[in-house]
């Protein structure tokens, strides 16, 4: 049997308010703080900040 994966899926939501999001994996034991990335949002055609939210 395969090992159980310790990573959790998190949703990175655009702060531009467009509703666009990305899904990433992170290990909660090694990365205790919330993720935030500056990535491209195609709805506003700019690089904006994406902040972590839990997947519902």
UniProtKB/Swiss-Prot annotation:
Would you name any one GO CC term?
A: cytoplasm
State the Gene Ontology BP annotations.
translation
Give the record's keywords alphabetically.
Ribonucleoprotein, Ribosomal protein
Query: Single GO molecular-function term?
Result: structural constituent of ribosome
Q: Give the record's family classification.
A: Belongs to the bacterial ribosomal protein bL33 family.
Q: Which PANTHER family match?
A: 54S RIBOSOMAL PROTEIN L39, MITOCHONDRIAL, LARGE RIBOSOMAL SUBUNIT PROTEIN BL33M
- HAMAP family named in the record: Ribosomal_bL33 (MF_00294)
Q: What is this protein called?
A: Large ribosomal subunit protein bL33
Tell me the gene name: rpmG
């Amino acid at each position: 049997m395969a090992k159980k994966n310790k990573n959790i899926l998190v949703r990175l939501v655009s702060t531009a308010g467009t509703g666009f999001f990305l899904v990433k994996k992170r290990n909660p034991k090694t990365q205790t703080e919330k993720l935030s990335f500056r990535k491209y949002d195609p709805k506003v055609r700019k690089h904006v900040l994406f902040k972590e939210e839990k997947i519902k």
